Swiss-Prot record:
Family: Belongs to the ClpX chaperone family.
GO cellular component, one term: HslUV protease complex
Annotated PANTHER family: ATP-DEPENDENT CLP PROTEASE ATP-BINDING SUBUNIT CLPX-LIKE, MITOCHONDRIAL (PTHR48102:SF7), ATP-DEPENDENT CLP PROTEASE ATP-BINDING SUBUNIT CLPX-LIKE, MITOCHONDRIAL-RELATED (PTHR48102)
UniProt keyword terms in alphabetical order: ATP-binding, Chaperone, Metal-binding, Nucleotide-binding, Zinc
Single biological process term from Gene Ontology: cell division
HAMAP family: ClpX (MF_00175)
Protein name: ATP-dependent Clp protease ATP-binding subunit ClpX
SMART domains: AAA, ClpB_D2-small, zf-C4_ClpX
Source organism of this protein record: Burkholderia mallei (strain ATCC 23344)
Superkingdom of source: Bacteria
NCBIfam families reported in the protein's UniProt record: clpX (TIGR00382), PRK05342.1 (NF003745)
Ion transport is among the record's keywords: no
Any one Pfam family match given in the protein's UniProt record, by short name: AAA_2
Record's subunit section: Component of the ClpX-ClpP complex. Forms a hexameric ring that, in the presence of ATP, binds to fourteen ClpP subunits assembled into a disk-like structure with a central cavity, resembling the structure of eukaryotic proteasomes.
Length: 423
């Protein structure tokens, strides 16, 4: 090894790669008739890391590592309760999408088109959780975008290419990785066309945004500013091809059931006509009959509907499903709060009647699974406030009276029970 400080040799040594002399670099490592400097070694390491990362993306999506639809469904079952048909549809769609990416480089007469996904279901039914779980399972970049914040380019608000910028941020601006990621666009129903009638005011967050999303979802070269930058004319942009990004759009689509019912249940005339009440069928059952024409009537443009060929509907969660959500998933709320209490060396017991009360309260509020945490948080607020300063508490018991606000949690001490908040 030679370095620039101790070089009194007659002949000056040079790096065989960059041509710098031993006086211009910190270290010069000798091989058989060749030399390499420390700067070239660092550059080689950087190239190897980048190539290894790109190879990792390819390897993670290879056929051998890609879980089967049944395996995807089994993993979704661990995190999402109910919605069996939606999980089955998603498992098949995601499997086919990444299987298609695996065979992109192979020459074939048949080209496989991308199948983006539309999730239709009420608030708190599990749409976002399903998309998050899929991304975590496949180890691909994932971003959630809110359609209500999007506007047409040139107006105040976020333009659609901001979605791709967030996706890049989530994978440290590795373009290859981002181009195989998953984008979940929430509240897609909120950008429906407001009316069939023309208006003098421009609908900058309705049809215009749908048109802008159309290109992104279909596949285009999105221009994204460099890290942390804003768009201005005289800068270089990062080009991201969205052709292989899987887009999952979700929305509650309030009022869509009426559109479907009006189409499917025609009123008969005469003695032989079948009279059927519109209230007989469950909303989830009605949504399963959704057709593209219903979505067009709701306010989505036909071109966007055509780019979302896979439609999965989620039903409203009933009391039994909400009770299961509280205790069964890997990250169940009850398990989370039990862990919080365990950090104080206290056991938390939430009785079945309390779970039932939480589920009923969420149904009354019409918040679905999303409202469960706030109900439990409210019920446990006082005891979580007092617990760190209380001595000798070994167990806290929650019943339905605590959830309904008619009672206090029962604190079990080493010797005698005591009610929280009592003197």
């Amino acid at each position: 090894m030679a370095d620039k400080k101790g070089s009194n040799s007659e002949k000056l040594l040079y790096c065989s790669f960059c041509g710098k002399s031993q006086h211009e670099v910190k270290k010069l490592i000798a091989g058989p008739s060749v030399f390499i400097c420390d700067e070239c070694i660092d550059l080689c390491n950087e190239i190897i890391r980048d190539e290894a990362a790109a190879a990792g993306v390819e390897a993670s999506l290879s056929k051998s590592d890609l879980p089967s639809p049944q395996e995807i469904r089994d993993i979704l079952d661990q995190y999402v309760i109910g919605q069996e048909r939606a999980k089955k549809i998603l498992a098949v769609a995601v499997y086919n999408h990444y299987k298609r990416l695996k065979h992109l480089d192979k020459k074939d007469d048949v080209e496989l088109s991308k199948s983006n996904i539309l999730l239709i279901g009420p608030t708190g039914s599990g749409k976002t959780l399903l998309a998050q779980t899929l991304a975590r399972l496949l180890n691909v970049p994932f971003v959630i975008a809110d359609a209500t914040t999007l506007t047409e380019a040139g107006y105040v608000g976020e333009d659609v290419e901001n979605i791709i910028q967030k996706l890049l941020q989530n994978c440290n601006y590795e373009v290859e990785k981002a181009q195989r990621g998953i984008v979940y666009i929430d509240e897609i129903d909120k950008i429906s066309c407001k009316s069939d009638n023309p208006s003098i005011t421009r609908d900058v967050s309705g049809e215009g945004v749908q048109q802008a999303l159309l290109k992104l979802v279909e596949g285009t070269m999105a221009s994204v500013p460099p890290q942390g930058g804003r768009k201005h004319p005289n800068q270089d942009f990062i080009q991201v091809d969205t052709t292989n990004i899987l887009f999952i759009c979700g929305g509650a689509f309030d009022g869509l059931e009426k559109v479907i019912t009006d189409r499917t249940e025609k009123t008969g005339i005469g003695f032989g006509a079948t009279v059927k009440s519109k209230q007989e069928r469950d909303a989830g059952e009605v949504l399963r009959e959704v057709e593209p024409e219903d979505l067009i009537k709701f306010g989505l443009i036909p071109e966007l509907i055509g780019r979302l060929p896979v439609v999965a509907t989620l039903g409203k969660l009933d009391e039994a499903a909400l009770m299961k959500i509280l205790v069964e998933p890997k990250n169940a709320l009850v398990k989370q709060y039990q862990k919080l209490f365990a950090m104080e060396r206290v056991e938390l017991e939430i009785r079945p009647d309390a779970l039932q009360a939480v589920a009923r309260k969420a149904i009354r509020r019409k918040t679905g699974a999303r409202g469960l945490r706030s109900i439990i948080e409210q019920a446990l607020l006082d005891v979580m406030y007092e617990l760190p300063t209380l001595k000798g508490v070994s167990k806290v018991i929650i019943d339905d009276n605590v959830i309904e606000g008619d009672g206090k949690p029962l604190l079990i001490y080493e010797d005698t029970p005591k009610v929280a908040g009592s003197n």
